[in-house]
């Protein structure tokens, strides 16, 4: 803590202040000299961090002497700007501004090693500027105490004022150790000056005391006479009851009108002890009937006056010490910032930019990690898709293009067996496991690969079961879900010479794309057209049935074999899953006496079916539906059922007795062909394995 070392008797303007000394104004009659000890700012006795000190020395050596001189100079505006931002107490801010102005005017080295110039420029002494170690201690040891000091100051919650600048501080408090603290910080000269009591000041304190305790007139007069004896205006020998021992240690100067009090600490403590009940509080009526009692009242007032003076000095000392510390630490902080800015200017990069670069680098690393994760997930999905479709898409498309070209060349030639120009290799192999299972065919992407290929059935194609129950007994009409007919190869029996042929009479233009194959392959197209053309297609179905009955003769065998009554004629009714009713007639004839074996017929048909067998493979890349999807979609119910009369069923069964006799043989062959189809397409449709097991079980 600062000490009071001297008294400015001739005025503070004439006093030779040394380093770290400032004047302390007590009252109109007293001004003391306040000094901060050297150990407060010891720049050599601190143990510094070796790494940080080495780094600071390197930065200090980077600056030239001229740049260092400029960096070690800050204006008053910078210091006071930091003051307004950091110090909330109004009294502290005003005290700092006042002290800085006094130092600018006087030029005293009060802030050593800081120096205040006449133009308000704050700088550092040359000895400290050239010594990097001292400068480091000043900036990073003492300069770091600014925030701690400001935070340690108690503040009022109402107006943010500190206790030293609060209005309550000026009121006298009960006696404590504060007077002893300030008494020990004073030099002997200061103590002698403190105990020199002015007579007029003591009289004011005495009158206040008499009014406060409501002395009567006689007692009041007694106290005033005791005061006059003390200052030497009355002769004490003429006063009856006067006690000279009470005024021992007190000496008056009548010419100068002041009183000298003994400087011994015990005597001061005795005087202040008399005044202690007064500061404890309470007003009471007092009396002084005799002179000795009046002398004690005068000593009490002397103790009150002395205590108030010591309390005022203690308060001024603490406030000025706090003001000096604030100004010193604010100046050090401003100089440190100026030095760091100069070093950063030389380095070309600031600490803030370094921090921003660190944040940017962290952000880049984070984004890189996220990008790697996204790429990893993308590769995982890609590998999963490759595993599901092992055949490359481009190879499949090239194969489909080649097959489409072959189909186009083949369909240009007419069917030699029956003279029809319909496509002979578009028959679809389907096995119907039970009456509730709907037929399914490959997607339209491969089946109808070229727009020039006609849509229709094979000339060797006949329907199996035609949507009826497999049993001879109890044949019932099937619903729309179960009446989807699978156009399969080799149902019809033909001669070896190919005389018996099935001519497909359905006109493409008239049917508007409703052929047998299209009811399987173009199920999505018929979905979009079904609602708009429902009535039109119903009429087309009836028309197609009538044409089939009238043109039944064209489906007969050659004339030599027509005498037999075993002619077989069956009609296939194809019903779409999307409630579009398609009626296709496909007829075949066989001789009851001379029927070709089933395997011979399949041998002939396979010559046409094998070249384009790969073209029937569904194209998974073009949105075609698999066999399972088509079968699942065929499960939908239909609000409109197309029934076949019982007479037609009985007539069909009577005319096709030979078909029913060879029924198991036909079924076995269909299973073999379907198994062969699934094996050929097993690499594209792994799900066919499940259908193979299901078909075998059924």
UniProtKB/Swiss-Prot annotation:
Subcellular location as annotated: Cytoplasm
Gene behind this protein: GGNBP2
Lineage, top ranks: Eukaryota, Metazoa, Chordata, Craniata, Vertebrata
Cytoplasm recorded as keyword: yes
PANTHER family: GAMETOGENETIN-BINDING PROTEIN 2 (PTHR13601:SF2)
Entry keyword Zinc-finger: no
Keywords linked to the UniProt accession: Cytoplasm, Developmental protein, Differentiation, Spermatogenesis
Region (Disordered): 555-575
Described function: May be involved in spermatogenesis.
Name of protein: Gametogenetin-binding protein 2
Gene Ontology CC, one term: cytoplasm
Biological processes annotated in GO: cell differentiation; spermatogenesis
Main location group: cytoplasm
InterPro entries: GGNBP2 (IPR026073)
């Amino acid at each position: 803590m600062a000490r009071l070392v001297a008294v400015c008797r001739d005025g503070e303007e004439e006093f030779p202040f040394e380093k770290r000394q400032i004047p302390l104004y007590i009252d109109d009659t007293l001004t003391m000299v306040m000094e901060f000890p050297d150990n407060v700012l010891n720049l050599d006795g601190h143990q510094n961090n070796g790494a940080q000190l080495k780094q600071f020395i390197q930065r200090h050596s980077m600056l030239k002497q001229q740049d260092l001189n400029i960096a070690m100079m800050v204006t008053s505006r910078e210091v006071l700007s930091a003051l307004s931002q950091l110090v909330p107490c109004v009294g502290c801010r005003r005290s700092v501004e006042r002290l800085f102005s006094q130092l600018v005017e006087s030029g005293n080295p009060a802030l050593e090693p800081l120096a205040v110039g006449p133009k308000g420029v704050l700088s550092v002494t040359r000895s400290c500027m050239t010594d990097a170690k001292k400068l480091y201690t000043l900036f990073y040891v003492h300069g770091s105490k600014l925030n701690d000091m400001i935070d340690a100051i108690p503040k009022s919650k109402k107006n943010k004022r500190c206790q030293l600048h609060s209005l309550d501080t000026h009121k006298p408090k009960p006696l404590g150790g504060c007077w002893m603290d300030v008494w020990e910080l004073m030099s002997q000269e200061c103590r002698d000056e403190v105990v020199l009591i002015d007579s007029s000041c003591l009289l004011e304190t005495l009158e206040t005391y008499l009014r406060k305790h409501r002395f009567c007139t006689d007692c009041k007069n007694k106290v005033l006479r005791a005061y006059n004896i003390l200052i030497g205006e009355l002769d004490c020998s003429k006063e009856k009851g006067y006690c000279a021992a009470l005024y021992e240690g007190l000496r008056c100067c009548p010419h100068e009108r002041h009183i000298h009090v003994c400087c011994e600490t015990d005597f001061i403590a005795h005087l202040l002890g008399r005044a202690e009940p007064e500061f404890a509080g309470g007003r009471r009526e007092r009396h002084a009937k005799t002179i000795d009692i009046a002398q004690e009242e005068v000593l009490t007032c002397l103790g009150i006056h002395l205590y108030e003076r010591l309390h005022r000095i203690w308060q001024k000392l603490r406030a000025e010490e706090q003001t000096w510390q604030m100004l010193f630490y604010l100046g050090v902080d401003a100089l440190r910032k100026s030095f760091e800015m100069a070093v950063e200017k030389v380095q070309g990069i600031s600490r803030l930019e370094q921090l921003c670069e660190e944040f940017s680098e962290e952000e880049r690393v984070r984004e890189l990690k996220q990008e790697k994760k996204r790429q990893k997930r993308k590769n995982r999905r890609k590998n999963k898709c490759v595993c599901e479709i092992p055949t490359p898409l481009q190879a499949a498309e090239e194969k489909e293009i080649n097959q489409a070209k072959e189909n186009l060349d083949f369909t240009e030639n007419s069917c030699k067996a029956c003279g029809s120009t319909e496509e002979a290799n578009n028959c679809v192999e389907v096995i119907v496991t039970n009456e509730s299972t709907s037929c399914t065919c490959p997607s339209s992407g491969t089946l109808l690969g070229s727009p020039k290929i006609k849509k229709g059935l094979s000339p060797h194609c006949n329907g199996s079961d035609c949507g009826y129950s497999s049993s001879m007994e109890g044949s019932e009409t099937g619903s729309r879900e179960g009446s989807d007919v699978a156009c399969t190869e080799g149902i019809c029996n033909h001669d070896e010479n190919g005389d018996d042929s099935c001519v497909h009479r359905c006109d493409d233009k008239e049917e508007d794309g409703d052929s047998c194959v299209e009811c399987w392959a173009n199920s999505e197209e018929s979905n979009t057209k079904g609602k708009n053309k429902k009535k039109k297609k119903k009429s087309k179905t009836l028309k197609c049935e009538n044409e089939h009955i009238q043109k039944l003769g064209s489906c007969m065998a050659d004339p030599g074999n027509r005498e037999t009554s075993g002619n077989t004629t069956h009609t296939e009714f194809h019903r779409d899953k999307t409630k579009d009713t398609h009626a296709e007639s496909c007829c075949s004839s066989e001789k009851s006496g001379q029927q070709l074996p089933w395997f011979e017929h399949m041998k002939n048909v396979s010559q046409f079916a094998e070249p384009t067998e790969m073209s029937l493979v569904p194209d998974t890349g073009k949105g075609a539906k698999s066999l399972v999807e088509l079968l699942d979609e065929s499960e939908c119910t239909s609000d409109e059922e197309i029934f076949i009369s019982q007479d037609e069923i009985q007539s069909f069964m009577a005319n096709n007795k030979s078909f029913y006799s060879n029924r198991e043989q036909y079924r076995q062959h269909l299973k073999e062909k379907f198994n062969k189809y699934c094996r050929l397409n097993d690499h594209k449709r792994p799900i066919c394995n499940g259908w193979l097991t299901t078909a075998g079980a059924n």
